[in-house]
Each structure stands twice: as C-alpha cells, then as structure tokens.
Amino acid sequence: MKRKLFWICAVAMGMSAFPSFMTQATPATQPLINAEPAVAAQTEQNPQVGQVMLGVQGADAPVVAQNGPSRDVKLTFAQIAPPPGSMVLRGINPNGSIEFGMRSDEVVTKAMLNLEYTPSPSLLPVQSQLKVYLNDELMGVLPVTKEQLGKKTLAQMPINPLFITDFNRVRLEFVGHYQDVCENPASTTLWLDVGRSSGLDLTYQTLNVKNDLSHFPVPFFDPRDNRTNTLPMVFAGAPDVGLQQASAIVASWFGSRSGWRGQNFPVLYNQLPDRNAIVFATNDKRPDFLRDHPAVKAPVIEMINHPQNPYVKLLVVFGRDDKDLLQAAKGIAQGNILFRGESVVVNEVKPLLPRKPYDAPNWVRTDRPVTFGELKTYEEQLQSSGLEPAAINVSLNLPPDLYLMRSTGIDMDINYRYTMPPVKDSSRMDISLNNQFLQSFNLSSKQEANRLLLRIPVLQGLLDGKTDVSIPALKLGATNQLRFDFEYMNPKPGGSVDNCITFQPVQNHVVIGDDSTIDFSKYYHFIPMPDLRAFANAGFPFSRMADLSQTITVMPKAPNEAQMETLLNTVGFIGAQTGFPAINLTVTDDGSTIQGKDADIMIIGGIPDKLKDDKQIDLLVQATESWVKTPMRQTPFPGIVPDESDRAAETRSTLTSSGAMAAVIGFQSPYNDQRSVIALLADSPRGYEMLNDAVNDSGKRATMFGSVAVIRESGINSLRVGDVYYVGHLPWFERVWYALANHPILLAVLAAISVILLAWVLWRLLRIISRRRLNPDNE
C-alpha cells in the first residue's frame, strides 16, 4: 500500500511540473476581458528564432531573424467577415468564422483577437459561453456572466501564433442555454451578436528568403495575401513603345493572378523602390542601381536582393534590346512554370494556337454547355452541411454583349442531392439570381425516388433529384451570382418540465452535382455602344479577345510616370477580368498609324490630332481647358437607357480651370463601324492620380456608364450623350424585333397590318382553290 501511495505522489508531482498548454480565459466580470494563455507568455519569453518558413523544406529554408522587419496589421470583421461584417450566432446556427492568410515570406509572431459582442439577456450565466477556435484548435472559452447579459462586452483573447498557417480560419462557437431543462435550440431568445468592429491584431515578421524563382510569383504576388497587389514597375527613363508593350504584358499577367484582390502598378523612373518590384533593363538603358550588372546575351529574368534592404526582392527583366524584353515578358506570362534558380534565360516563346473571341478563362463559355464543376473556385463550393445548411453560391461571369432580349430563358440542368426529410413537409430548395428569387422545389421524403444513389459514391440517406430550371434572361448581367438555399423544417425538442421531449439534432447535407450544366451557346453577341459600364465591369470591348490581339493602345511620346501607370493599371484591370495576359497587345505612340486598322483603340494621355475633330467625341480634356457636350435629358440610373432624342447633344460647354480633372470617354471608331475607342484622359498629375484611383477601385468603376465619365475630387459623374452604334451581329429578323422593341405602338400597328395582309392572302388563296374546284375545265 505504501508503494502505491509513493507512485501516486510521484506521478502527481511530475504532472505538476509540466506547464499548462491549455488556453485559459477569465470570466468577463469587467467590461474588458483579457484572456492570457500560458503559451502566449512562454512565447514572449522565448522568441521564435529559427522557425522555418511555412511551406519550405530543407536545410536552406529561411528562418525568422530577431531583428527582421515587422509590420502590425489590424483586420476588422468589417473587412474579413462575410457581409455585413457582424455575426448573429443562434442556437441552430451557433458558428461564425473569419478567414485570413499569411504570406509565404512572413510569419506571425503575435496575434490578439479583439471581440465586441452582446449576449441575449435571456441566457443562463456561466452555462452559456463563447468558444474560440483557430484552425479547429481550441484557443479559449469566454463564459457569459450575469453582468454581461444584454450589454455590449469587450474581450481580448491572445492567439497562439504557432497554430497560424498560410490559410487560417477563426471560428466562434456559441453555446447558449436559457433554461435548465427542455430547451428548444430554435428559440429566439438564444442569440449572441458579434459586432463588425471586432478584429484581429497581428504582428507579421518578414523572412529573409533565398533568391529562388521556383516559388515564382512569390514574393511579387502571393495568393495567400488578401490585400491589393501593389507592385512597382521600375524603368531607366521614359520607355519606348517596345518596352511599354513588354511591361503591359507583365502587368496584365499579374492582374490576371490578382483577380478580386485588385492591383496597382506604381511607376518609377531610375529610382529604387521601397518594396518588392519589377525592374526592366537593357544593356544600354538600365537604372543607375544596376549599372555594374554584367551585360546579358539573351532575354534573362533574374531575382536579386534590393541594394539597400535584403528583405526586399527585385525581379529584373534583362535583355539586349526591347525585342529581348518583349520575349522575356512573354516568358513570364506563359513559361513561368519552368522557372527555378536565381535566373532563367528565355530561349523561345512560340504560340501554338490562336485565341478565339470570348474564350477568356474567367468567362463562362458560350460555345457549349458548361458544367458546374468548371465554375468551382474551390473544392467544397457545391456542398453544405448543418441543421440549416449555408447557401451554395456559384459565380457566372458573362461577356457583356451577350444578346438575351428575346430569350425565353437560359437552360440549366441541375443535379442535386440532399438529406431526406423524415416526413413530408415544406422543406424546399430556393434558387435565386443576383438576389432575385427564381424558383422553388420541394425536397421529397419518398425513399423510392432515391434511384440514382447507387450510381455515384455518396453517403447513404441522401436523396437524388434532377430538375430543369429556366433563368429569366433579362436578369443577367456581366457579373452574376447564382444562389441555392436549402430550407429544412427541422423537428425541434420542446414540451414542459413535466413532459419534455429531447433528442439529438442531426445535420443535413446538401450537394449540387458537378455534372449540373448551364447553357449559353444559343445566343448572339450584340450590344449598343458606347457603354462605359461594359468597359468598367468587364474591360469590354478589348476583352473580347483575351490576349488583346485586336487592341491598339495609343500612348504619348515619352510618357511620364503617371501615364505609364495608367497604361499598366488599365491592362492589369482587364487581365483581372479575363484571367489571361495581354500577350498580343499592340502599343504605338504614333496616332497616324491607327488609320484604317480593324481593331479597338485605347487612348491614354490625349486624343490624337486626327481624331480631335471627330463629331463622335463628346468631351475633351487639354491642360486647363476642357469642353463637354450635354444631352437633352439625363438619368442618374445606369439601368435606364434614354431614347435617341434624349441622348442628343443639346449644348457644348467650354471651361478653363486650374483644378484637376480626368475623364473616360467612349465613341465609335472612325475607321471601322464595328470597332470602338475608349480614351482615358487627364489634365494634370493630380488628374492622373484620380484616374488611376478610379481604374483600380471597383466601387468607383461601378458608377461609370454611358459615353462620358467625368472624374473630379467630388466623385464620378457619367453621361449618356451622342449617337448610338451597334457592335455584333444579329439575323435580319432579330434586328427588326430589336428596332421595334422600344416602339410598342408602331409594333402594334405593324402587327395589325400583318394580320390583315395575311388574312387577305389566305382569302385570295381560298378563292382560287374554290374556283378551280368548281370549274375544273378552266385549269
């Protein structure tokens, strides 16, 4: 017995020697809660010197230096939580989450979660609590105290940085109770509201990474970084046409990778950047900080350290001349999968197949039916689980000129599976498009309908359904969101204290099959122009060819930094819309060369002299003087298209001012009636700053429509003024219907005349047949 007591005491003393690795949170008896985990304290005492950069293996992997540069970031729920940023956690939907990433060349050394929440006044103290998880690891628990009920509460919880990876999810789980027995999880008294001002305070430390192109495009673009990709472009001086084209290809490729994050390409002439950047240099023209670099004998792409900061990397695009730089740029855009080492030589980039119209990777294909599997952006996008499953969303990016006016609908064949309701009730699947309800389908509880279950590897208990849906075509735009909501009538426990019914709620599972299809292949391409909304939303008409092979950009001779920045930001924005680089873009600084070209024209800086007198132009910006034509009647709503008489120019006003202004204008090309001109103009450096800000800001682009968008300090004002022209092709009968669509009275008159003529022809035909039948000898 003494031996047993000895061993028990020894084990107890040994266990007490271990530090506690469990996050502890003190009850929130004060307005501010500070939950300090033992691990966090230990981390501060022992800095993480020597931690290997995540995702990199081997003896040469970079480590965290104690004196390395760091940055402090505050991510609010308004920025990173699902809209609107606040969360209401309920008994049947107890979970809410936020997501954030970590760049490959950084590690998080400190993290603090700041919560602002209000618990329901009906909750039971202490039994109700808020659990915090990071990547499914419990970070701590915040009990709800009596003093907090119905009041705004502030809480701080340290997050262990050892659990932070390249992609992270912070999950809040609400455990709520409002009575000791016989609770209903659907009770409206079970809630906890998390405010949108809650957030994460993170300290990132930069890693001293190797110069290795095998990780390209990291660190110049990191898909784990949710911020706008700001990537300076450095030139020795004002670039000529060949170098402008090469830099535009690189910018459009980075834009295609940035996607929804946005992109910004500041331009520097013979200056050192203060962050990761792209540098263009030839043997004869190079920035001063590269003057000692050996001359190259071929197109070379090299990753080097910043001369003054080893934590900043420069991607240098070298060449003997502009032709080499153009080949190197195409190598970045199309051959980067082969990059490795500190430098690569681009021997050849040879096109094998030409691009086709409307084949942009980010657009839904219009030449055949498309499966939902092709539209997924991540693996589990088309499935959901929960007592009330979250909605399933699918994005549809369409060409802006898809003609859907007389369409009866878009064919969509949906294959879906779902957990079978236990009884026949009102459980259903609702389908919405752009927040507009389309159709609803009942979720059947009949087991005999489960015939397709054996043909596909799914869990037992799921019911298969196949449904055809017609989408109202007029509700579609260039960017669309298709939403599937599965609504279950879940049985809930309840009763009284003496007669209580309890059971364990079972999660429901719903799946939209990858083989579901949507078909846009039966429709023509036809659009009235000018339409700056098509340009602002999808880069149209330039994006019709994803490689911009039918686009000519007219630049000023010896462009300044702001004008080059406008070029790079514009092609970067178009690349983000198409998902493909502008490898075949043509750039010129001679406005006379565009005459007679079968191409869409992008003008940056100023209207060429040969076009200044064109009657189609509705606005002109030149230094301090500008003029604009205004229409007879103007509507502020982009969805309302005025008729021809309202668009007619009524006045032309000319003004002189020292204030900054920029503009985007669209008009028909004088050289081809199926081509368009988009001009991006500014009158000063501040004007170009506002223009670039508008190009990079999706919210400001959304306010552009019509033929003229004027950009001032106060915002953007758009006008529809001047003549309308049409781009695309319609059969003659569709053109007739389109012409009559805005004239219902004329359409009714023509319909009546057509009926009368048809009746007269039939009457004459019947008379002839009757005469021949009664007098066969007269044949």
Please report, for each region that a protein language model flagged, where it lies by residue.
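C-terminal segment of classical bacterial N-terminal signal peptides
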Residues: 15-24
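Solvent-exposed alpha-helical segments and adjacent loops
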Residues: 26-779
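Sequence-pattern detector for short linear motifs
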Residues: 5-7, 27
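Positively charged n-region of N-terminal signal peptides that target proteins for export
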Residues: 1-4, 743
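Sec-dependent N-terminal signal peptides
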Residues: 7-13
